[in-house]
Amino acid sequence: MNALLSNPFKEGLRKGDTQIGLWLSSTTSYMAEIAATSGYDWLLIDGEHAPNTVQDLYHQLQAIAPYASQPVIRPIEGSKALIKQVLDIGAQTLLIPMVDTAEQARQVVSATRYPPLGQRGVGASVARAARWGRIDNYMAQANESLCLLVQVESKVALENLDAILEVEGIDGVFIGPADLSASLGYPDNAGHPEVQRIIEACIYRIRAAGKAAGFLAVDPAMAQKCLAWGANFVAVGVDTMLYTEALDNRLVMFKSVQSVSTAKRSY
């Protein structure tokens, strides 16, 4: 099969396009397909905080595949074995959480690339990603089309940000606001002025290094701020949060109850 692998999400990052995404935490292919029909540029399938198995991730990739929205998978960690599984089921873009050092970033790069560029295990003949061995020159194409994003979400990671940005093979850096604010001493308060100052500075440093900058903002005003600061792949909501807010708001229209969604909410 003379198919050529492409990764529109990665191509958009290279061009500097602004790409708007949505976080998927519901773990179901049904919800993933509903989100894919909405027209978001990218959909983050969360395997870190949502109870997704590898098979769950697989089914959601299948559900999204017919649509223009591009899937991004966040595994629970950046282990070589887990990365191998997730890539084999067809993920082309990964977001790796809790990357604190340049050495960690290099290890992740190696885990996502086939030899001689890395240490990804070879098994294309049994992998959905290679159409079960039917894509010619798959290993070279996979190395080229892979998009790797890492999360900076701790005080240690901030101290090592410049070194992380120098690692070849990293396409973008995603700022994790919840963990970052907690690490800085402001738990559940990503809106604190000091945290905001640091986020803005990080986005500037990431873009200045020629990398894409990403963020998750469930508050529309914060999302607009990040876009204005230069972030070019921004998730503007979480499916489970949007669902609970809609349910609560609909209920309060008909019953004298306090809507949960009126309380301050953060990811």
Swiss-Prot record:
Entry keyword set: Lyase, Magnesium, Metal-binding
Site (Increases basicity of active site His): 88
SUPFAM superfamilies (alphabetical): Phosphoenolpyruvate/pyruvate domain
Keyword Lyase: yes
A GO cellular component entry from the record: cytoplasm
Superkingdom of the source species: Bacteria
Cofactor: binding details: Binds 1 Mg(2+) ion per subunit.
Known partners and oligomeric status: Homohexamer.
Function: Catalyzes the reversible retro-aldol cleavage of 2-keto-3-deoxy-L-rhamnonate (KDR) to pyruvate and lactaldehyde.
Protein name as annotated: 2-keto-3-deoxy-L-rhamnonate aldolase
Organism this protein belongs to: Salmonella paratyphi A (strain AKU_12601)
